[in-house]
């Protein structure tokens, strides 16, 4: 994947300027040092960028005019633009965001006491999970740091400007949009660092969640890079079913995946000792009571809570949505084993913003050999 990778070290724009949204605080301080400035100037600019969603150096009134002029010559603050907005009857908002000549989708989900932003990490996805709309679009490229944190920046600016409507500020971010975050570690981790940074968005590490389908070598590496909440897209109680609906399982099976999860939990404080298990409910595929018993046995040594997700259909999908009665029976079996089990409330399905429905506008550049490599052969973390 190295030909598609954009790293934080290569952040100049087409006009030769540095997009400051591509830099975490350490990189920002190095940039200001190269300008002959003190590190605290970087902190001041970051505060303007993220606390006030400011992208105009002239509005940064505690920065002297000479430095503002210098910044305008060599840098910019450019977040990707929203090109389409859809609002659900339940208050969910989906934004289509332009990244070059393509689009990714970002979803804002307000609740009584919080508001969650679902953020994309790639243009498309190469993992080919059979129940997910994004996977059917193919894969084009990784998003760069500015395109990931820029989704949060853009959403915060929109929500902040609309306080009179009662919309809540963003309290949680979930890396559960388009793409597999662990296949874009070089850009996802710096973006999450900005989310956590007090001069960035200042979110608690327990309120930033990364979801993965099981790229085990990258998960091993993640624990040494950053501490955030972890959710895993399990979706099956055994390898036979998971091989079919989550093809990466053919390389990194459930036992290997869960072992890596337990290792991450040993390093992490953000998870409070347990991982979130995501389990999409597919009618008569993985939703029987026998599957629930298998799942309980599978997870007996993995501290977790379980989110059961009613499947959200999309055109051409080969599955059906589990009935409420089947979901209820499945949930009761898990609870009888003592598992905290939640049936996720579907949000935004009337605008195709629910789990598994994000599609965007993707020019598929995924080569057949690349898909095979990602599903069935070792993944080189240096190229992730």
Swiss-Prot record:
**Which residues are responsible for catalysis?**
105, 355
Q: Where in the cell is it found?
A: Cytoplasm
Which keywords does the record carry? Answer: 4Fe-4S, Cytoplasm, Disulfide bond, Iron, Iron-sulfur, Metal-binding, Methyltransferase, rRNA processing, S-adenosyl-L-methionine, Transferase, tRNA processing
**Cysteines engaged in disulfide bonds, as pairs:** 118-355
Domain Radical SAM core per the UniProt entry, residue ranges? 111-350
Recorded hits in InterPro entries, A to Z, give: Aldolase_TIM, Methyltransferase_A, RlmN_N, RNA_MTrfase_RlmN, rRNA_lsu_MTrfase_RlmN/Cfr, rSAM
Coiled-coil stretches? none
* Entry cofactors: [4Fe-4S] cluster
- Annotated binding of S-adenosyl-L-methionine, by residue: 179-180, 211, 233-235, 312
GO CC annotation terms, alphabetical: cytoplasm
What Pfam family does this protein match (any one)?
A: Radical_SAM
As for what it does, the entry says: Specifically methylates position 2 of adenine 2503 in 23S rRNA and position 2 of adenine 37 in tRNAs. m2A2503 modification seems to play a crucial role in the proofreading step occurring at the peptidyl transferase center and thus would serve to optimize ribosomal fidelity.
Spell out the protein name for this chain. Dual-specificity RNA methyltransferase RlmN
Species annotation: Escherichia coli O17:K52:H18 (strain UMN026 / ExPEC)
């Amino acid at each position: 994947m190295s030909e598609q990778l954009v790293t934080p070290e290569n952040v100049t724009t087409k006009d030769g300027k540095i997009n400051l949204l591509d830099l975490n605080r350490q990189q920002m301080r190095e940039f200001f040092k190269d300008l002959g400035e003190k590190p605290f100037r970087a902190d001041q600019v970051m505060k303007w960028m993220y606390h006030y969603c400011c992208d105009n150096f002239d509005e940064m009134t505690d920065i002297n005019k000479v430095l503002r002029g210098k910044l305008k010559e060599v840098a910019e603050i450019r977040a990707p633009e929203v090109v389409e907005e859809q609002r659900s009857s339940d208050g969910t908002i989906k934004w289509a965001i332009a990244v070059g000549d393509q689009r990714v989708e970002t979803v804002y989900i307000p609740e009584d006491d919080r508001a969650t932003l679902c953020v994309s990490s790639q243009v498309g996805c190469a993992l080919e999970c059979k129940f997910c709309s994004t996977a059917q679009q193919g894969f084009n490229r990784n998003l760069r740091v500015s395109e990931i944190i820029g989704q949060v920046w853009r959403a915060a600016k929109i929500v902040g400007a609309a306080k009179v409507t009662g919309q809540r500020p963003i309290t949680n971010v979930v890396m559960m949009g388009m793409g597999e975050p662990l296949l874009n570690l070089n850009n996802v981790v710096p973006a999450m660092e900005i989310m956590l940074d007090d001069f960035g968005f200042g979110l608690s590490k327990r309120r930033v969640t990364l979801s993965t389908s099981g790229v085990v070598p990258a998960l091993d590496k993640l624990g040494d890079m950053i501490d955030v909440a972890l959710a895993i897209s399990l979706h099956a109680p055994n390898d036979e079913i998971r091989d079919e609906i989550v093809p990466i399982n053919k390389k990194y099976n459930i036992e290997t995946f869960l072992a890596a999860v337990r290792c991450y939990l040993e390093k992490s404080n953000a998870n409070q000792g347990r991982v979130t298990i995501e389990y999409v409910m597919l009618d008569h595929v993985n939703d029987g009571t026998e599957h629930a018993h298998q799942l309980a046995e599978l997870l007996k040594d993995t501290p977790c809570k379980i989110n059961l997700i009613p499947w959200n259909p999309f055109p051409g999908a080969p599955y059906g949505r589990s009935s409420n009665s089947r979901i209820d029976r499945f949930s009761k079996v898990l609870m009888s084993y003592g598992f905290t089990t939640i049936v996720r409330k579907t949000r935004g399905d009337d605008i195709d913003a629910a789990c598994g429905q994000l599609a965007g506008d993707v020019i598929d550049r995924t080569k057949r050999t690349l898909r095979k490599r990602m599903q069935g052969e070792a993944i080189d973390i240096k190229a992730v």
